[in-house]
């Protein structure tokens, strides 16, 4: 990972290959961060680095700035106006299409010139207050456009722009350290050895395989680290590929960051009121987790033959973030099928989605992919595939000290007094004597049994030997 940010600087022409090699040598010799080595050697200034790391997307002022054709945008505007019962305003169209007033004004001028719309009412000389209405010709063209695609919404961004931004805000340029991993996992009880493995794995920005028995916290670890990934990324609302539209932004996955200047109906009137191209939303890095419900078609572009546009696949929506495949091996598809789909993306860092026409296109495969499984990895995949997964980490059962600490935290969270003697009683009688492994999820589950019983008896829950005996009797299966 450390070198990847340097590679981006080389690609942008900010430093040379030779300078990168010198910086990497110093970084490996002295430690710290690669960017600090680049700065200390004087290859770039702090201002240049800051501009590089916190780039922005310029606001389009004219149709040509959008990267889309006039015909495409006019059809999109006509469809949006058609759904407004044929009457519309500049402000409303700017809001629906996520385009600045200046671009929509240019589009409206085109539709008026072609007699596709006419001014209905105007309270002043400003175009922003004019109410326009589609002409019969405009309605007919809108209906024809609907036959091509029912998509109405934010104007898409061109594929090339999406691919560039995806590479520019790569998850591999994030520099993570021990302080970050400690902070991200402070809510979990994890041994130092495991922490020392997890830190470099996530910091690499590469694929990770978490394996081990159930209940040991693999999913919680992946989620905690995923949600702790720092940084902001630009997410397109939609993408245009050869005239086809891919709906991309998903509110269930992408969490926008409040931006007062890019918010509200009136924010699109002037360039000075926009911080970036409104077709993009500034969001936290996405974290996507799928489990047994995953099927092979969920990893492909989904074309709706009735609406005639695409929905981006789930892993594509995780771009510049973290994709967690939980319970790997429990899916309805064979693990080998799933892994064959991802051999090239994991190995080469590119993916090749396919349109329903058969056309394929290339996009960067930029995400931290985490496989989590309770099964033996060697029974799921062959060694050749495991070699393509950079980090393989065995998450083992908890130690006695870790188990007790989890018990203490669970009691504290439920406002139940923790008794160390009761904890010793639980371990001695129900784990050590019975040679039962110390599973990290058991304290939470046992406490839930204790609380259920206390609620039934209309008593406050207590962490006592009697409560433990009752909870254990209902929790473990004895044959």
Each predicted region: which residue ranges?
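Non-catalytic accessory regions
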Residues: 1-65, 102-114, 118-131
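Interdomain "pre-motor" coupling segment immediately N-terminal to P-loop NTPase/helicase cores
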Residues: 102-174
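Conserved AAA+ ATPase "SRH/arginine-finger" region at the nucleotide-binding site
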Residues: 390-403, 416
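Short acidic, hydrophobic short linear motifs in intrinsically disordered regions
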Residues: 84-96
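Conserved AAA+ ATPase small/helical "lid" subdomain
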Residues: 407-469
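A short helix-turn-beta junction within AAA+ P-loop NTPase domains corresponding to the substrate/partner-engaging
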Residues: 341, 381-396
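Dynamic helix-loop-helix/coil hinge segments at AAA+ ATPase domain boundaries and subdomain interfaces
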Residues: 69, 166-195, 433-434
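Conserved ASCE/P-loop NTPase catalytic core
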Residues: 186-371
């Amino acid at each position: 990972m450390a070198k990847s940010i340097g590679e981006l600087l080389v690609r942008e022409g900010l430093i040379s290959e030779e300078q990168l090699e010198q910086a990497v040598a110093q970084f490996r010799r002295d430690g710290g961060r690669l960017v600090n080595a680049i700065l200390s050697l004087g290859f770039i200034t702090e201002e240049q680095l800051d501009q590089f790391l916190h780039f922005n997307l310029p606001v389009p002022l004219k149709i040509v700035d959008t990267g889309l054709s006039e015909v495409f945008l006019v059809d999109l505007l006509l469809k949006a106006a058609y759904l407004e019962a044929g009457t519309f305003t500049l402000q409303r169209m700017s809001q629906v299409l996520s385009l600045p007033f200046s671009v929509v004004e240019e589009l409206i001028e085109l539709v008026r010139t072609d007699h596709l719309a006419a001014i209905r009412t105007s309270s002043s000389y400003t175009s922003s207050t004019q109410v326009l209405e589609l002409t019969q010709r405009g309605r007919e063209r809108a209906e024809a456009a609907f036959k091509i695609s029912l998509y109405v919404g934010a104007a898409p961004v061109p594929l090339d722009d999406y691919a560039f931004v995806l590479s520019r805000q790569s998850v591999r340029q994030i520099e993570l350290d021990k302080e970050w991993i400690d902070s991200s996992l402070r809510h979990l009880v994890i041994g130092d050895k495991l922490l020392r493995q997890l830190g470099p794995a996530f910091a690499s920005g590469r694929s990770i395989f978490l394996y081990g028995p159930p209940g040991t916290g693999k999913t919680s670890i992946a989620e905690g680290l995923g949600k702790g990934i720092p940084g902001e990324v630009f997410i397109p609302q939609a993408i245009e590929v050869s005239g086809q539209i891919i709906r991309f932004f998903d509110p269930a996955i992408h969490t926008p960051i409040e931006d007062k200047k890019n918010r509200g109906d009136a924010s699109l009137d002037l360039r000075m009121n926009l911080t970036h191209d409104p077709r993009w939303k500034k969001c936290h890095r996405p974290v996507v987790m799928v489990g047994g419900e995953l099927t092979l078609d969920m990893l492909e572009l989904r074309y709706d033959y009735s609406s005639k546009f695409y929905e981006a696949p789930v892993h594509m929506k995780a771009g510049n973030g973290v994709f967690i495949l939980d319970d790997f091996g429990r899916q309805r598809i064979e693990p080998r099928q799933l892994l064959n789909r991802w051999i090239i993306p994991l190995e080469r860092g590119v993916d090749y989605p396919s349109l329903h026409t058969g056309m394929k296109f290339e996009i960067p495969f930029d995400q931290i992919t985490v496989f989590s499984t309770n099964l033996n990895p060697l029974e799921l995949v062959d060694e050749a595939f495991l070699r393509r997964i950079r980090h393989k980490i065995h998450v083992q059962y908890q130690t006695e000290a870790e188990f007790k600490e989890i018990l203490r935290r669970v009691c504290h969270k439920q406002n139940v007094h923790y008794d160390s003697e009761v904890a010793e009683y639980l371990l001695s009688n129900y784990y050590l004597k019975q040679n039962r492994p110390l599973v990290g999820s058991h304290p939470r589950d046992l406490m839930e049994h204790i609380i259920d019983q206390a609620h039934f008896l209309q008593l406050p829950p207590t962490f006592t030997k009697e409560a433990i005996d009752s909870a254990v009797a209902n929790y473990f299966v004895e044959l």
